[in-house]
Amino acid sequence: MSGNIAVDPDKLEQLANDVVTELTDMENKYKDLHVELGQMILQCDPRYSSCFSGVGDAWSSGKALVTKLSDNEIFIRKTGDKFVEQDDILRKLYNAYDKYGTMTSLTALMLTQGKYYGLGLTKFVKQPSGLHTAQHSKLLLDISRAVDSSRYQKAARVLLNPKYLLKKTNRPFSDLVHKKFTKYFPQDTVDFSNSVRSYTKGFLNEAGVRSTLKDVGKTGLRFAKGNAITATLITGATETFGAGVKIAENYAKYQDKPEVLKRENAKAVGNAVNNTIFVAGGATAGAVIGGAIGSFAGPVGTVLLGAAGSYIGGVVGEQIAKYTAGFAEKAALKLKEPIHAVVDTAKKGLESAGKVVKSVNDGIDAANKSIHKGIDSAKKGMEKAKKTADSLIHGATHFLKGKFSFG
């Protein structure tokens, strides 16, 4: 039996497209049949209404059949995608953004936090009680006082974040700078770190009270909020970009197949939402756990290990998202019409983008063919070299047996 299986992904995709055509037709027919049967029953003479008691439920049975066909279409298309993926060497090497974009961004955030504390702009001073207080550097405090007392205060705040024009107006500029680079307000970091240290080590706060588990949870929620916003924004931006590229590609591929286009766009949106929920959720949970562990080294440890925990949690969330992707796709398919209505408002732009995506994909396909051609040539060369080596070994063995045989 041959060790290679020949599968044409294009034929699998065509089969999936045909299934969509059939299930769309089936869906229209069972809905029409349901309406017509209902009208006929209502219009018939009441004396004969009992004759329809054995008539099946066209809606339920039709929906069940369409659902089965829909599941088969998803399976067929994913099978084809897997074959394409395995054959696509160039994307495996280069498509890091799709797989690791979110994780790279979270790592970059951790490095930024480390640099900020490394510059000494904010320090956490350990008190005799074993707990910490936040202390900004003289340079940052001087700049903060100058900004907060100047007429350019609002402009400076907007440069850090436009929302600070209306929100956090009571916060000093120095705290907003800390938030900009670390994603947390210094007091939130201190409170979470101190509550963990107080609860686990018995340290007493200024009021002479030891923190309870409730205090840890309360301060942890404030700490988590900062990470949740950051993780959701990072993941959401990555997934929105990925979904946008996929939808543009769909417009290029399925422009003449409106029903396939609706389904594929719905799947793209469903996957983006699914990934955002689980990656951001995992990152947030990881940040709280990592921050709690890091608290034993003080507030800086809370932030840095919180970022590390966020990264690990994001990786875990990404793996979980793979298992829930199927459910997300099916849920999105139920909303394919409203999703398509929204997406189609940008039809012209997506069609133009789709042409660019198609040209890029064509270039990648051509490059893959060249790579495979080179690999095939190398394989043939290796096989030839192996045969030559085998021949030489066989000849040498025969020669040695003949000349040095003691038999």
From Swiss-Prot:
It comes from Bacillus subtilis (strain 168). This is Uncharacterized protein YfjB. Residues 10-37 form a coiled coil. Keywords: Coiled coil.
